[in-house]
């Protein structure tokens, strides 16, 4: 927004501090094993302090400002990953940052109007894993207007994903009928989503964005 660079990055290298961060990411081993953990934050604190020190009246304690800063932070994070990987580094996104934001806020001592958005681990990779399966490009592209998905299109677009040996095994070991049930019933349940939504909203209020 307005070239304000509404993001900050907290670099965690210290082993003890990585250990403190780990529970916020459900103790995924990569948090403590990677040389560096980077937490990308939506940051309107810096801009607000600039305004206050320049006889200006900031008005960024609201949800729209959070969305603008979160967008900035994610764009910067992905750009950083692209550049890092071009230099031979490996990155891995942790999808847990917005699940327990308050504990990350407390651990990293984030002030008001700063909110954790994305976390990556960074280092030189010692392996080259295969890329995860992706939906076909035509499943995400809509020409001119949004075209909703018929049952036939869903069958077409998810056929490859549902029929990889890994995913078929995933369904079997979880005693489910379909891969979708693994996601809705086990991995990302309505109950968990609602509970985590509540804690995330509370953290947004605590940080001054609501």
What are these regions (language model features)?
Residues 1-210:
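Acidic, surface-exposed loops and disordered segments
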């Amino acid at each position: 927004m307005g070239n304000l660079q509404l993001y900050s990055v907290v670099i965690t290298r210290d082993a003890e501090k990585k250990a403190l961060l780990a529970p916020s990411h459900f103790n995924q081993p990569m948090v403590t094993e990677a040389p560096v953990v980077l937490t990308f934050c939506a940051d309107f604190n810096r801009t607000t302090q600039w305004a206050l020190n320049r006889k200006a009246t900031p008005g960024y304690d609201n949800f729209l400002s959070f969305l603008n800063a979160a967008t900035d932070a994610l764009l910067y994070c992905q750009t950083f990953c692209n550049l890092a990987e071009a230099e031979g580094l490996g990155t891995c996104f942790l999808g847990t940052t917005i699940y327990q934001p308050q504990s990350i806020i407390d651990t990293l001592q984030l002030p008001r109007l700063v909110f954790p958005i994305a976390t990556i681990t960074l280092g030189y990779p010692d392996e080259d894993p295969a890329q995860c399966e992706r939906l076909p490009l035509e499943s995400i592209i809509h020409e001119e207007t949004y075209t909703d998905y018929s049952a036939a299109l869903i069958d077409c677009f998810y056929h490859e994903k549902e029929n990889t040996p890994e995913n078929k095994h995933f369904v079997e070991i979880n005693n489910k009928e379909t891969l979708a049930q693994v996601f809705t019933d086990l991995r990302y349940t309505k109950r968990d989503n609602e509970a985590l939504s509540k804690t995330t909203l509370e953290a947004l209020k605590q940080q001054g964005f609501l």
